[in-house]
Structures are given as C-alpha cells and as structure tokens.
A protein has these predicted regions:
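ATP-binding/phosphotransfer module of carbohydrate and carboxylate kinases, centering on a glycine-rich
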Residues: 6-152
Length: 152
C-alpha cells in the first residue's frame, strides 16, 4: 500500500498522474513541504514506507479516488491469497483471522476487505485470532523445531 501510494505521489508531483490527497497528508506528516522532499527521504531510507498505508486509509476515508483505488487493488490481492489457499487446501470452509493494525482496526480498508471476502467467498468465516502474532510465531517455531528433530 505504501509503495503504491508513493508511486501515486511521484506521478502527481511530475504531472504523470492525478493529484491526490495522499500528497497533502504525507507532506503534513513529514513536515516536508513538497513531494520532491518526500521522494528524497524514500531514496535515503528515512521514510518507513509501510507507515504510509495509514495515510492512504485516511485519504480514502476523505473520499480520495486514488487512495480508494490503491486500497481496492490491495484488498483484491488479499482475496486472491485466500482463493489460493482454498485451492491448495481443497476446501472453501475456512476461518480467516486478521492480524495487523491496518486490517484489525475498523477503517475504510478493513471494511472493504471484509465486504469483498463476504461477497466473493461467502463460505469463509472471519474470526478473531486465537493468539497474538507473537504467540503464533512461538507455536510455529515449536512445531518447526519438533519436525527437524529438536526437543518440543
């Protein structure tokens, strides 16, 4: 999401793309004064690209069509991941749990994603995670350790 947003900001800045509220919100957050300054921060590794996703959600909630398109594309990608999982597991009766603030918290993106899942994959049940991410990582590490001959 962040990478696509920065691409949109770059295109808006040099005239290859439409103006977007993402530019204004990012300028305000970075106190940069210009899209060129933001691009310099990206190239100098002084900008956490993933953090830009929250700005995209904010812009979408304000009705910015570029932000809405970015989130729509990314929600489609997550639905495609679920479809791939359905194919690999040969079942469409799955529970799906979200992890991460972008989709855990109620916002434009999480609502859009849930709506897309419900409309395209009606047998999928969205559930709360049984464990926090760290708990899941520990459980996975324990399973991997056991499978390679370690003590579990």
């Amino acid at each position: 999401i962040g990478r696509k947003a920065l691409n949109a900001v770059s295109k808006a800045s040099d005239g290859r793309g439409e103006e977007t509220l993402i530019s204004e919100l990012l300028d305000a957050k970075m106190k940069s004064g210009s899209s060129a300054s933001i691009i310099n921060k990206v190239y100098n590794d002084k900008l956490d690209v993933a953090s830009v996703a929250k700005i995209v959600i904010e812009a979408a909630e304000e009705g910015d069509p570029i932000a809405e398109d970015i989130l729509d594309e990314e929600a489609d990608e997550l639905v495609l991941h679920i479809k791939s999982l359905i194919y690999k597991l040969q079942t469409d009766n799955l529970n799906v749990a979200f992890s991460g603030s972008l989709i855990d918290n109620k916002n434009f993106y999480s609502d859009l994603l849930k709506q897309k899942i419900k409309s395209t994959l009606p047998k999928i049940k969205i559930v709360k995670p049984a464990l926090p991410p760290l708990g899941g990582a520990i459980l996975l590490a324990k399973r991997l350790s056991s499978s390679i001959g370690g003590q579990g």
